[in-house]
Structure formats: structure tokens, C-alpha cells
């Protein structure tokens, strides 16, 4: 037979466990996991060398690219994050107004991708496209989004930013 004391114990114990879990999970030590990676870091200079031509995959990847400079730990660094994306290869088709290489579903993904680029540009991200790559994949320079700076050879940009201290993340 259950008494009031028997009913009280399981509820209070459960409440205690939930409180402890909440405190532990809300603790900064458990929140990020970036303590080792950002130890001593004062600035965030990142260059993403992007060649991925699949629109759906590009959207998934760009969520992570965008999130990388939006996390609180990066935003709280002494210097504002500097992010550059250089487009090469098949990725150049994703930044063109010519959607003929894509079916309807892919075209919708391209529109979403281009909207993300516009938003990231407003957030201060710089974009460059390799015009040699555009020529190789058959993209007319005139169809490239106006938010994206044109460079003759994207490798020169990648090397230049790397020499300036940017971390290079290659996304094939």
C-alpha cells in the first residue's frame, strides 16, 4: 500500500534529477565544445574554397558555413569574423541566373542557395568567382550574381588570402 511519503519521494527525486540535468546542460562548459579550438584565438579569418555543384548539397554545406561565423563563441572574439568564399568548378553554375542546367527541383534549390548568398553578403561575407572556371563550365560572366566579385584565377585569391593568415577550408 502506497503512503503519501512513497508518492512524494519519486516525484521529488525526479524533479531533483531534472534540475541537475538542466543545470549541467545549460552550463557553458557543456554548451559549445569550442574551448580547445578557440583557445587564444582573437580573430576568425576563414576562406571557403567551394566547388560543389549539387544544389541540394550546396544548401546543406552553406548552412554550416554560415553557422560557423554566427555561433556565439566566434561572434564574441575580439575582432569581427572575416569570411570569404571563392567559387570554382561546377559551383559556378549555382551562382548564375541561367538555370537551364537544372531540373525544377534543382532550380528551386539554386534559388534558395542564391538567397542564402544574398543574406550572407548583407552579413559581411565576401564572395569571389573564378572566371577561368566560369569559362570552363560554360557560364556566361554576365549571368553571375552581382553580389559576387569576379577574379581571373580563383587560385590566386585562395593563395593570397592564405598568405594573409586566412584558414582555408576546401569544399570539393
Where in the sequence are the language-model features?
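Short stretches within intrinsically disordered, low-complexity N-terminal or propeptide regions
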Residues: 7, 28-31
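N-terminal secretory signal peptides that target proteins for export/translocation
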Residues: 1-10
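Bacterial N-terminal signal peptides
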Residues: 12-26
Amino acid at each position: 500500500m502506497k503512503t503519501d511519503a512513497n508518492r512524494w519521494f519519486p516525484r521529488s527525486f525526479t524533479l531533483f534529477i531534472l534540475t541537475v540535468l538542466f543545470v549541467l546542460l545549460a552550463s557553458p562548459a557543456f554548451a559549445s565544445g569550442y574551448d580547445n579550438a578557440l583557445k587564444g584565438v582573437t580573430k576568425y579569418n576563414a576562406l571557403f574554397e567551394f566547388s560543389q555543384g549539387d544544389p541540394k548539397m550546396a544548401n546543406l554545406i552553406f548552412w554550416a558555413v554560415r553557422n560557423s561565423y554566427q555561433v556565439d563563441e566566434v561572434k564574441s572574439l575580439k575582432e569581427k569574423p572575416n569570411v570569404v568564399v571563392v567559387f570554382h568548378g561546377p559551383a559556378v553554375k549555382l551562382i548564375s541566373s541561367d538555370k537551364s542546367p537544372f531540373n525544377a527541383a534543382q532550380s528551386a534549390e539554386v534559388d534558395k542557395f542564391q538567397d542564402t548568398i544574398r543574406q550572407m553578403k548583407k552579413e559581411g561575407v565576401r564572395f569571389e568567382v573564378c572566371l577561368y572556371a566560369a569559362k570552363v563550365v560554360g557560364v556566361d560572366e554576365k549571368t553571375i550574381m552581382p553580389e559576387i566579385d569576379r577574379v581571373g584565377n580563383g587560385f590566386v585569391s585562395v593563395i593570397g588570402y592564405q598568405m594573409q593568415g586566412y584558414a582555408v577550408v576546401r569544399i570539393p
